[in-house]
């Protein structure tokens, strides 16, 4: 868990929301880098959202271990284990997890209706 805490503190937008306590909502289609918002302590996920996971990459779309590790650092342990076990982080193909599953299976907070 220490790496997740370091990750959260190192990102300015994450720090802003974590300090303010303001709720950050993930809604709609959340592709790849958008999943970094999962690092925000006060994040919630809309039940109808779709989050798309893939390996981290550089600007040339070449997969890199450092970018993938950076992304994995935004995820809680259960989600991190799932995306690793399913090999989602080994390809640039998108792998969808729906908001309902993020809430029920991985313990993320549901956004208020």
Language-model segments: what does each one mean?
Residues 1-19:
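Extended, non-globular alpha-helical segments
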Residues 5, 13, 26-28, 78:
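Amphipathic, alpha-helical segments enriched in basic
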